[in-house]
Each structure stands twice: as C-alpha cells, then as structure tokens.
C-alpha cells in the first residue's frame, strides 16, 4: 500500500529546545558502535587497547564523522554554495552530511589515534569496520524520518509519497490528506531509497561483516569487505535515488556523484582483499582487566 509520509521530524521538545529524530539516530549510531566495540575489546580483539583506549578511539571517530561528513558535503555536493557563503559550513542544523566525507574524516581521525598508540592502521580499521554498518542504518532511517534523499517515481505497492518533494511542496496539508484518501496522489509515489540503503548498508552489511569477523581474519580482509560492500550497495541504490539537486547527473544521464565516489571504494576493497591473502592474522590477547570484568 502506498504510504503518505507524515512523520514529524521532531521527536520531542525540552522547553525551547527541539530534539530531532535525526539527532537521536546519531546517538543510536554512536551507542551501537560503543556497545559492539566494548564486547570485542573485552575479548582482546584489538591487542594493547583497553576500554579507556577504545573510548578515546570512539571520540576520535565521532569527530571524524561529524567534521568530515559536513566538510565532504560542502566540497562534493554544494561547493558553489560554500564559496558564496563559507559560514554555511557551520550551519549543521540546516542538514547536509556526506558518507564519503565522513569516511575520509574517520580515516584521518583514526590514523592520528593509531599513530599515537603505535598500532598498525589496518588492524584498527579491521576492528572498526564491523562497528559502522548499524550506524549507517540508523542514519538512513533518520533520512527517511526527515523526508529527505527520496527516490525516483515508482508504482510499486511500497512507494512513499513525500510531501516535501518539489511537486507537492506547495500543497496545504489538508489538501494532501484529502487527495491521498481519494487515491489521487499515487502517481507521486517514490522509491523509499533511504530504507533500501538502511537495509543494505545497515542490516545486510552488519550481518555479513560481524559474522565474517567473528573469528580473526587476515589483515586488510575486513576493511576490504566493508569498502567493497558499501561501494556496491551504494552504487546500486543510486539508480533509484534522485541525484542531488545542485549536481544532477554528471555523465551518461545516469551517473551520479554518489556513484563516482563509490567506484574508488569498490576498487580499494578489491585491492585490500587481494592483499589480505598474504597478510598476517592478528590474534586476540585478552587484557587482564577485561578478563576480570568479563568474569563478573
């Protein structure tokens, strides 16, 4: 049944402060990463790192996600707007985050953390990779709740009518409800591409990566699988997702910026998987403190 999107993006208010679902999704993403990471730290899956060190790593990662995601969006998707008004970079409440920018931010932040702790960069990345997909899924759910990043038109029974889409943005809510009840809005239904990405980048990637990494794998393997899966899934979903308005299609009347940025990920993923065939396997070393905590 075609659904009319009518979700309030504001979860609740605390006096004058409005708490948005999108912000709560970020909290859920970071909490899931902490909970999953904690379980593996206690099992010694990142030798030499205790919970204090992991909390520090998570903080670095959070900064990388937020700063990299925002800067990446401005550079990849809204560069002209940024040049006209550089201060818009700090207006995060107006929306605009890029996964690829966030990924670069995380790589830089974790690289700094790794150098400080004198660990191999890809041992850390292999540890971090399985902690990420659930956060990606929560982020895409936030996009859906906010009614943004919608897909192309579809007549599939699971299509969603987004009132903020250009063709309906000027319609009064009462008129939308009346026309929807009469079945007159079905032609405006769109692919819920946010939910497709939540399922693929969130659920499927998490199940595959978490299961694959349950036993120690060769260095590069988990990171390579993450890059490959994300690149492929994002490239596929872009075919039913409306390209970002300022850019549109960049080539062949179908190639989007999201696909262009995903192609290098696919290549990097394949290279890392190839390198893993001759790489060492990092064996768990359970910290003494972790053993005591686990025993409790």
Curated annotation (Swiss-Prot):
UniProt keywords, alphabetically: Cell inner membrane, Cell membrane, Membrane, Transferase, Transmembrane, Transmembrane helix
Cellular component, GO, one term: plasma membrane
GO molecular function terms noted in the UniProt entry: phosphatidylglycerol-prolipoprotein diacylglyceryl transferase activity
Recorded topology in the membrane: Multi-pass membrane protein
Transmembrane segments: 10-30, 57-77, 92-112, 119-139, 194-214, 220-240, 255-275
Pathway in which the depicted protein is active: Protein modification; lipoprotein biosynthesis (diacylglyceryl transfer)
Covalent S-S links between cysteines: none
Binding residues annotated for a 1,2-diacyl-sn-glycero-3-phospho-(1'-sn-glycerol), in chain numbering: 140
Subcellular location: Cell inner membrane
EC number(s) on file: 2.5.1.145
GO BP annotations, alphabetical order: lipoprotein biosynthetic process
Family that this chain belongs to: Belongs to the Lgt family.
Cited function: Catalyzes the transfer of the diacylglyceryl group from phosphatidylglycerol to the sulfhydryl group of the N-terminal cysteine of a prolipoprotein, the first step in the formation of mature lipoproteins.
Entry-linked Pfam families: LGT
Enzyme's top EC category: transferase
Superkingdom classification of source: Bacteria
Native source species: Xanthomonas campestris pv. campestris (strain ATCC 33913 / DSM 3586 / NCPPB 528 / LMG 568 / P 25)
Name of the featured protein: Phosphatidylglycerol--prolipoprotein diacylglyceryl transferase
